[in-house]
Amino acid sequence: MFDRPTILDEAFSRRVAAHDFPDSRNNAASQSFAPHVLVDLFDSQIMSRHLDLWARRSKGKTFYSIGSSGHEGTAAMAAATRTTDMAFLHYRDAAFLIQRKKQAGGLTPLHDMALSFAASADDPISGGRHKVLGCAHTFVPPQTSTIASHLPKAVGAAHSLGMAQRLQLADAVLPHDAIILCSFG
């Protein structure tokens, strides 16, 4: 049987083991991120990809929808923002959520996402209703696979930032200098 994800994963592993890397015009020293940050981002991207592979292998034992492969770069968006910057995510942005939860510390992104894939009642964001990306602790409202239903929510959240400043709310949930992120596609 032709299994493209496994073929790609094995080819990648062989090239890394052989130190067979493509030539690059950039290097870690020329980047604005420290090398350990780049490794951490790569780790989040690999975690996201391996969650997809795990879910494919668990077919029939877990709930599974479209994977996050191809959206691994969103981990960089998470690294470039704060855990208090609200993020309304595309349903395939698992790498963002993994990186955001790692930044917050004390959270278990892979365990939580496995619970979500299995529609477990112990899933901390959906309680077993569906594969959902989200985390209350890191200001990522839950988002299922409904296409673009989170866009109006993101606009409302962004509007609320200005309102909170104009009203000089001392107990606003988000910091006064927060930004609202929204990914879609």
Which residues does each predicted region cover?
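Charged, compositionally biased N-terminal leader segments and the immediate start
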Residues: 1-32
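Cofactor-binding active-site loop characterized by glycine-rich and histidine/acidic residues
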Residues: 53-185
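Positively charged, low-complexity intrinsically disordered leader regions
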Residues: 30-45
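Membrane-targeting and insertion segments and their boundary/processing signals
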Residues: 12, 25, 29, 48, ...
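N-terminal glycine-rich anion-binding loops that anchor highly charged ligand groups
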Residues: 43-54
